[in-house]
């Protein structure tokens, strides 16, 4: 019996096989270095004009968010076909570049190529928002004329696109849906999603009940609709009926209860969630929920549990939790997340660092904010604006103006948000003339047209120092209608300088815009009281009563070791309210004369 030695294939055969295998996987590759290496091999083999390979390369570059490179690949092909054009249109659509997608479409027509049943769905993916509705309608007409609506993929894309164009778009989507001779699950789900996004829950539920066949997407979409509108009893009822559930189902319930302020039920749902369904997203939802409510102990405990489970925070999780800390002022949890970041590879992520900077700045820890700001290797405009705003609102106006000067020296061009921060800083620092100069420099120097927010800052700036005539002139000559913020700033200035007559006129304008805001009436009442015009005070209170406007109770909050505690006037909901009122009483009572000690 003889045995033969295995025949070894030449090296060029194995390298070609590897190359072909990589080409097969290319459209799914999101590693830019690997894509670039393969692109270099394609050019070396003179395959860059291959109409089978070029679309794959464009798809891979799209996943890597490198549309400029994708355009270069497209331009290297002398005679593109419809498939190649569709690939580039899709790449622009995936990367939120609608105008570039339509430019490729116009180039396609210049080449004499006809759109197919993939071209329009890719173009429709690029359109989103009410302003795109006329364009979508125009494409709908083209689709009908070309006879492409017989392919169910095309009307499904139209329904999805119409649904992203606001309430009017949803109506057009419904008209198309009702006309369709054939519908699949995607058609039903797209229409259901559109109704849910538009807040049309009754119509959405009717459609859901009519569905001939529901999949998990159908159930989750309807569940999300109830959760978004805080209708958690209906959401729970639907959740209980679900034939199957996944991570999205459980997360929607936890998020819904959390947003509705019912952290007890949010925790019940989280604890009931099967272990395989718990991922970074679900942990983030529950931690951020507790953080938003200022419940430090529970949030801290859950952070410990998540770390112990072996899961690691990703950028999205950190940003969400930091945003919740910012909203509630829960600085200690934000600092805890910061310490975790130092031990992870997220410490250099620009989005994470900006979120951390925002949290410290808004919570008033400006030293930490500056430390984070200085640690950001490549500061973008968001970093500068956040630091400027933090300094401005916390009374460090001069430091903010110095930072603005440094920003300009470093060649960073300010935007409209920058100038809101700068004007607020001038306001807090009493830099009136400088603030006026900055306001007028917006258009003269930076070609930025001031918006209503900037005019509001200018009115507040002038009003604070008693230059009310100038402030009124600004309001009268501004190019847009003054809003509640503008009139509110003027009313605040009237109170500061006891300008009763002007305040009456200002309130009349405020009432036209917002008749139910008790703060405006209270402010005018205080102005009358300061001027000892008690008839005016009585008149305002009478007006409030006749209109059913009630002044909300004043509230204050304090962060202690276990979280944030809030107190309102005559509130007895706190578990230790008896002890609190007893201590408050002892503080109010005058001390015993015998206990007084003379201070020399």
UniProtKB/Swiss-Prot annotation:
Keywords: Repeat. GO terms for biological process: RNA modification. One of its GO terms (molecular function) is mRNA binding. PPR repeats lie at residues 50-80, 81-115, 116-150, 151-183, 184-218, 219-245, 246-276, 279-313, 314-348, 349-379, 380-414, 415-445, 451-481. Residues 486-561 are annotated as: Type E motif. Residues 562-592 are annotated as: Type E(+) motif. It comes from the Eukaryota. InterPro entries: E_motif (IPR046848), Eplus_motif (IPR046849), Pentatricopeptide_rpt (IPR002885), PPR_At4g14850-like_plant (IPR046960), TPR-like_helical_dom_sf (IPR011990). Belongs to the PPR family. PCMP-E subfamily. This is Pentatricopeptide repeat-containing protein At3g29230. It comes from Arabidopsis thaliana (Mouse-ear cress). The gene is PCMP-E27.
């Amino acid at each position: 019996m003889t045995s033969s030695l295995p025949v070894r294939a030449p090296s060029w055969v194995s390298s070609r096989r590897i190359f072909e295998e990589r080409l097969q996987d290319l459209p799914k590759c999101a590693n830019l270095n690997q894509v670039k290496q393969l692109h270099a091999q394609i050019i070396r083999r003179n395959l860059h004009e291959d109409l089978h390979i070029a679309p794959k390369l464009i798809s891979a570059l799209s996943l890597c968010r490198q549309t400029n490179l994708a355009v270069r690949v497209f331009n290297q092909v002398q005679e593109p076909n419809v498939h190649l054009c569709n690939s580039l249109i899709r790449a622009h659509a995936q990367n939120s570049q609608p105008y570039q997608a339509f430019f490729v479409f116009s180039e396609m027509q210049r080449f004499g190529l006809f759109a197919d049943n993939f071209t329009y769905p890719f173009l429709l993916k690029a359109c989103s928002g009410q302003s795109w509705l006329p364009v979508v309608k125009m494409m709908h007409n083209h689709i009908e004329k070309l006879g492409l609506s017989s392919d169910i993929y095309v009307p499904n894309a139209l329904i999805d696109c119409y649904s992203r164009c606001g309430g009017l778009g949803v109506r057009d989507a419904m008209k198309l849906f009702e006309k369709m001779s054939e519908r699949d699950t995607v058609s039903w789900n797209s229409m259901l999603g559109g109704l849910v996004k538009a807040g049309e829950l009754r119509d959405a539920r009717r459609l859901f009940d009519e569905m001939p066949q529901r999949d998990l997407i159908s159930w989750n979409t309807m569940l999300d609709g109830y959760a978004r509108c805080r209708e958690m009893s209906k959401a729970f009822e639907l959740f209980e009926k679900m034939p199957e559930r996944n991570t999205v189902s459980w997360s929607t319930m936890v998020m819904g209860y959390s947003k509705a302020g019912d952290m007890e039920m949010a925790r019940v749902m989280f604890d009931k969630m099967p272990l395989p369904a718990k991922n970074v997203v679900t942990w983030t939802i529950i931690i951020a929920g507790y953080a938003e409510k200022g419940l430090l102990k529970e949030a801290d405990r859950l952070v410990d549990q998540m770390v112990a489970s072996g899961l690691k925070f990703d950028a999205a999780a950190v940003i969400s939790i930091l945003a919740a800390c910012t909203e509630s002022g829960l600085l200690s949890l934000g600092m805890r997340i910061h310490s975790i970041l130092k031990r992870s590879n997220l410490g250099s992520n620009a989005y994470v660092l900006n979120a951390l900077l925002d949290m410290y700045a808004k919570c008033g820890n400006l030293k930490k904010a500056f430390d984070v700001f200085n640690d950001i290797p490549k500061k973008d405009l968001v970093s500068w604006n956040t630091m400027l705003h933090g300094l401005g609102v916390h009374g460090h106006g001069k430091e903010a103006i110095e930072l603005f000067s440094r920003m300009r020296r470093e060649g960073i061009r300010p935007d409209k948000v920058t100038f809101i921060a700068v004007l607020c800083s001038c306001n807090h620092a009493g830099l009136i003339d400088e603030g006026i100069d900055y306001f007028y420099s917006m258009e003269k120097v930076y070609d930025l047209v001031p918006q209503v927010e900037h005019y509001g800052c200018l009115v507040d700036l002038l009003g604070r120092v008693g230059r009310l005539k100038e402030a009124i002139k600004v309001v009268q000559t501004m190019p847009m209608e003054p809003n509640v913020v503008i009139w509110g700033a003027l009313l605040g200035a009237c109170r500061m300088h006891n300008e009763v007559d002007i305040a009456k006129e200002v309130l009349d304008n405020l009432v036209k815009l917002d008749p139910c805001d008790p703060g405006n009436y209270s402010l005018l009442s205080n102005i009358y009281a300061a001027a000892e015009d008690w008839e005016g005070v009585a008149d305002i209170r009478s007006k409030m009563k006749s209109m059913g406007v009630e002044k909300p109770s004043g509230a204050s909050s304090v962060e202690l070791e276990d979280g944030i505690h809030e107190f309102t006037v005559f509130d007895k909901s706190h578990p230790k309210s008896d002890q609190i009122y007893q201590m408050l009483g002892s503080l109010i009572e005058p001390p015993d004369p015998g206990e007084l000690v003379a201070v020399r």
